[in-house]
């Protein structure tokens, strides 16, 4: 993967210098598992590492200026992003101006500009960027989730530091959960990772996952991709939607059975609340479409001012499924509308929104599928 050796060299040096490293993740299932993989992996090789997962409402997606300022206050030397960062050029430049080292691990689409009929990547000024979607990255699988990119990074670091390769096996189940939960194509390498992860998930050593399986009455079930996508995964996602993703990270990092059981119960209850709110929002969106001129639009844009912003993407997905048209759901923000979109195979939301970037949004993040 492009920049892998450079990224390994950087952290090898930083660890030898006992520099403070901060992982900045994301609040969804891919971001939480990515953060956990990097946190555990870097701690294993002796890094002085901590983590920060942005709050969906208070912070928004990705790395923002106030997170750079906080890192400066905390005397952080090196920032490692996961499942975000590729579109944060201004924020990365801010970190660089403050003397920090920045390593991006991400899997989202690379921003670009059109020049003479060709797309030119617009990359942030990070010290190393691990993202297989970079045009000049030779890594063959362009459809990795963020957790697998993080896993690849830890694998390379383990090799450099002489950590036994068998220790990587503990991350397979996390890679599988993120791959299914972030809706990656289950082909080739992804399929192999998911198969291996599912085999290990039933007998996982992770106390948090053990208790989450128990809280959802799956102790005796043959756990499949369905259970990740529709039972366990939504519980991990629920905290980032309705509470704080730190709760899901705490579940994965739980040290006792009692702590794990409590957190698993909390997440399962949150997911039940999420289901009820999603159904209510979906019904309202359908009512609006069916009773207005929206039903004639090729791209459906529905405004639900009272909908929790974290549910916009799920509801947009349900609308897309019902009408087989690209769908956006916008919710009320303090100074602007916030929302999420889900598309169909023949329509690239990313490309269409890039065309009207100057007027349509302040930050763009879309699913990679």
Language-model regions, residue ranges each:
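Catalytic PLP-binding core of fold-type I/II PLP enzymes
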Residues: 92-111, 183
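Flexible, glycine/proline-enriched loop segments at strand-loop-helix junctions
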Residues: 79-82, 137-141, 183
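Intrinsically disordered, low-complexity repeat segments enriched in small/polar residues
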Residues: 150, 365-368
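Generic beta-sheet signal
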Residues: 52, 82, 105-107, 130-132, ...
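Phosphate/diphosphate-binding loops
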Residues: 86-87
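Hydrophobic helix-and-loop "lid/oligomerization" segment in the mid-to-C-terminal part
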Residues: 1-78, 98-99, 116-119, 125, ...
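Conserved phosphate-handling catalytic cores of large alpha/beta enzymes
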Residues: 103-105, 109-164, 172
